[in-house]
């Protein structure tokens, strides 16, 4: 028994040493037990993941392990779904930007810089789950909720609760407003949250939330946890492939631009230009006639 434990310990030490030599961050066992395991479950359309190793970003890939500090950005047609240890789910909507600031179970935090997200958070026993925007902080212990930075007015954040549960919303001065089922609030930068009112502006996300609820349930059922070594190995395997894919896409886009430029049609003279040319020609003809 002791011999088997020694073998396991040696194998784990060797795996960590290989990761360190490759220049990759290593998750300790203690960290793995106290942190959520974040994973990009689905990426549709334009989704880019920015990491410490790839600051220019790589295309988002399904089942890609994510680490604290990673940023996920969606384009005009993009959407992404992120799982935290198979317990909680985040749906990132188009034109959004989310950073996994902190994945500690006791006090996790996501930072939304642009756009909107929907979240399905299971009941937390003593832990706290927060979403921070430039103007507000939404703290939950288990519920279905949405957060949106107003596209027309980025200084304003909307927070709403869809299902049963509570979300505590605070502004810059620390003043709090608690939302219950079917309620929302608005927070302007530097101001306190408005008193809770009936879900209105975020109500348009209700059908999307219902669909995500089903996928989150399936995600929990199919979730297979990975060890820190497996996550690092998976990430090390995926990043070079995704980087190559980004380069191929950039090259293809450049070729398409050049092709479109080469095929740019010669603009035909407008009718008024043609009329002016005829008049000029008539004048030239008359002048030549007088000269003769």
Regions found by a protein language model. Give the residues of each.
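N-terminal domain-start segments of secreted/luminal proteins
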Residues: 29-73, 79-83
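Short, surface-exposed linear segments at secondary-structure transitions and domain or protein termini
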Residues: 66-72, 99-103, 147-151, 184-195
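Conserved short histidine dyad/triad with adjacent acidic residue
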Residues: 32, 55, 92-96, 139-151
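C-terminal interaction modules
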Residues: 2-15, 19, 25-35, 56-61, ...
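Surface loops and adjacent helix of pleckstrin homology
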Residues: 52, 77, 85-87, 95, ...
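Short, small-residue-rich packing micro-motifs
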Residues: 45, 66, 72-138, 160-169
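Short regulatory "switch" loops immediately downstream of catalytic or recognition motifs
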Residues: 1, 48-52, 148-150
């Amino acid at each position: 028994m002791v011999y088997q434990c020694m073998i396991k310990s040696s194998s784990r030490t060797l795996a960590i040493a290989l990761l360190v030599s490759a220049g990759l961050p290593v998750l300790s066992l203690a960290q793995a037990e106290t942190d959520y395991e974040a994973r990009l479950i689905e990426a549709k359309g334009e989704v880019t993941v920015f990491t410490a190793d790839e600051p220019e970003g790589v295309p988002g890939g399904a089942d890609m392990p994510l680490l604290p500090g990673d940023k996920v950005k969606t384009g005009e047609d993009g959407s992404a779904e992120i799982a935290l240890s198979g317990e909680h789910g985040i749906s990132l909507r188009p034109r959004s930007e989310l950073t996994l600031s902190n994945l500690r179970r006791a006090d996790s935090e996501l930072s939304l810089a642009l756009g909107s997200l929907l979240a399905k958070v299971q009941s937390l026993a003593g832990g706290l789950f927060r979403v921070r925007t430039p103007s507000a902080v939404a703290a939950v212990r288990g519920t279905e909720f949405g957060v949106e930075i107003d596209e027309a007015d980025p200084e304003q954040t909307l927070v709403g609760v869809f299902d049963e549960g509570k979300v505590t919303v605070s502004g810059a001065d620390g003043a709090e407003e608690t939302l219950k089922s079917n309620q929302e609030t608005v927070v302007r930068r530097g101001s306190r949250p408005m008193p809770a009112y009936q879900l209105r502006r975020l109500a348009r996300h209700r059908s999307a939330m219902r669909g995500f609820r089903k996928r989150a349930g399936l995600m929990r059922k199919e979730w297979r946890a990975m060890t820190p070594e497996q996550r690092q190995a998976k990430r090390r395997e995926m990043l070079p492939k995704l980087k190559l894919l980004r380069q191929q896409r950039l090259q293809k886009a450049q070729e398409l631009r050049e092709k479109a430029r080469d095929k740019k049609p010669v603009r035909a003279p407008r009718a008024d230009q043609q009329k002016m040319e005829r008049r000029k020609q008539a004048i030239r003809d008359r002048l030549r006639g007088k000269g003769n």
